């Protein structure tokens, strides 16, 4: 399965509250499908994620990956070509949380077939350190989330859409 990755202008959303002032961090770590094969975005899977800040000077990054369900193998597999976004810097970990998203465009399924898709959001908190007179960046924490329903997001199509999976039809 091939995807034509289309980066969107879904810029990170910055809340002005410090990380210590918001809801529990677990409430701010998720991924959802917010676009699925609509008239405005045919044959497109949109994935959006949110990650919590931790009040530090770390920088937060997200990367999105597309998966398809292989009925013959009875398992989810990563889309190999065009199914991975670049790492997107979403901002400072001093804030309560940050959001961003990415859209994957696919060739339309052949008549009589469908593609069942989901997204995976990978999250990194990166820190800079002085090591032997050089500034180096390390990954202080990393995790991932599979898409799930129930998260209202900006730029959803249709408005308010949030799902765990996306089915592309011809």
Place the predicted regions along the sequence by residue.
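Proline/serine/threonine-rich low-complexity linkers at boundaries of modular beta-sandwich domains
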Residues: 22-28
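Short beta-strand elements
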Residues: 127-170
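Short beta-strand segments and strand-loop junctions that repeat across beta-rich extracellular domains
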Residues: 60-81, 116-126
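Contiguous beta-strand segments within globular domains
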Residues: 37-51, 59
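Solvent-exposed serine/threonine-rich low-complexity stretches and specific carbohydrate-binding patches
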Residues: 76-97
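Positively charged n-region of N-terminal signal peptides that target proteins for export
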Residues: 1-5
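Bacterial N-terminal signal peptides
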Residues: 7-18
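Signal that preferentially marks extracellular ectodomain short beta-strand elements
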Residues: 94-113, 124-133
């Amino acid at each position: 399965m091939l995807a034509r990755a289309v980066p969107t202008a879904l810029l990170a959303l910055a809340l002005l509250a410090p990380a210590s002032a918001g809801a529990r961090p677990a409430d701010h770590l998720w991924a959802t499908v917010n676009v699925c094969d609509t008239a405005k975005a045919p044959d497109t899977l949109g994935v959006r994620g949110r990650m919590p800040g931790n009040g530090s000077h770390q920088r937060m990054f997200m990367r999105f990956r597309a998966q398809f369900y292989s009925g013959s193998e009875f398992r989810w597999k990563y889309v190999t070509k065009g199914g991975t976004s670049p790492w997107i810097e979403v901002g400072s970990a001093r804030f309560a949380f940050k959001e961003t998203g990415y859209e994957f465009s696919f060739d339309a399924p052949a008549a009589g077939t469908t593609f069942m898709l989901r997204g995976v959001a990978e999250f990194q908190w990166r820190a800079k350190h002085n090591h032997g007179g050089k500034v180096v960046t390390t990954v202080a924490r990393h995790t991932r989330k599979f898409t799930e329903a129930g998260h209202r997001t900006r730029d959803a199509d249709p408005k308010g859409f949030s799902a765990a999976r996306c089915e592309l039809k011809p």
